[in-house]
């Protein structure tokens, strides 16, 4: 599961929108919304692309994309 609060907080810090995330992942904005809000899962490729967009380093990756 995605740590929704961390992802949304990082998006806010970088002034990114769900449309920006959707463009990065080559998906529709409603799909990006569902993934960010844990309605649909991210696959590993999408998580890696989003981590680059959000400037998340490898040491922080798990805090954003592997929550219980």
Predicted regions and their residues:
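A short, Lys/Arg-rich alpha-helix, primarily the initiator
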Residues: 1-16
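Residues within the helices of the helix-turn-helix
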Residues: 8, 19, 48
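DNA-binding alpha-helical recognition surfaces that contact promoter or target DNA
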Residues: 9, 34, 63
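DNA major-groove recognition helix of helix-turn-helix
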Residues: 36, 46, 65
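Short, basic-rich loop-to-helix N-cap that marks the start of a DNA-contacting helix
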Residues: 39-49
């Amino acid at each position: 599961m995605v740590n929704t609060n961390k992802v949304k907080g990082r998006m806010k810090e970088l002034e990114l929108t769900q449309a920006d995330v959707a463009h990065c992942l080559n998906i529709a904005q409603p799909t990006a919304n569902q993934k960010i809000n844990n309605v649909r899962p991210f696959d590993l490729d999408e998580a890696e692309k989003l981590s680059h967009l959000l400037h998340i380093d490898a040491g922080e990756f798990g805090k954003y994309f592997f929550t219980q």
